[in-house]
Amino acid sequence: MRVGLGYDVHKLGYNTPLILGGVNIPFNKGLIGHSDADVLVHAIMDALLGALSLGDIGKHFPPSDMKYKNISSLKLLNYVSNLIKSKGYSIGNIDSTIIAEEPKLFPYIPDMRLNIAKILKVNTSIISVKATTEEGLGFTGKKEGIAAQSICLLYNNLKHSIDL
């Protein structure tokens, strides 16, 4: 078994969509970044990569590389999913939290879970997504950005093998 922890944050700005978990959320602001700035999917990818000591998303998808400009983070998640499978691992579960003062995200969480589960080819029952606020504190509380945290558990599929 391997455990990974991921974290991501992006600044909120105007004239850009708000995409979380691959869901386009109606809001007057969006997240600014090189890709689609989906902090939830970015945190999940960092957790998965970290569990296998494979670096982070900046290593695999450098912001200096224009082929990742405005790319859907779900496409990047598909790459990470294939990478962990190629190493002989499968996902036990993923637990994530989005930290945002607004908008209210509860209505969109089922679609986020479904999008992530489809890409990872797992049941939605092992994908947890929650949303919380910071009660007006910090940059998320001041509505300057959105953050996400994720933790994952990976299982080694290879019988009688030594963990990485």
Swiss-Prot record:
Protein name: 2-C-methyl-D-erythritol 2,4-cyclodiphosphate synthase
PROSITE patterns assigned to the protein according to its UniProt record, in alphabetical order: ISPF
Family annotation (InterPro entries): MECDP_synthase, MECDP_synthase_CS, MECDP_synthase_sf
Top-level taxon of the source organism: Bacteria
Entry keyword set: Isoprene biosynthesis, Lyase, Metal-binding
Pathway: Isoprenoid biosynthesis; isopentenyl diphosphate biosynthesis via DXP pathway; isopentenyl diphosphate from 1-deoxy-D-xylulose 5-phosphate: step 4/6
Binding site for 4-CDP-2-C-methyl-D-erythritol 2-phosphate: 8-10, 34-35, 56-58, 132-135, 139, 142
Organism this protein belongs to: Clostridium kluyveri (strain ATCC 8527 / DSM 555 / NBRC 12016 / NCIMB 10680 / K1)
Top-level taxonomy: Bacteria, Bacillati, Bacillota, Clostridia, Eubacteriales
Cofactor: binding comment: Binds 1 divalent metal cation per subunit.
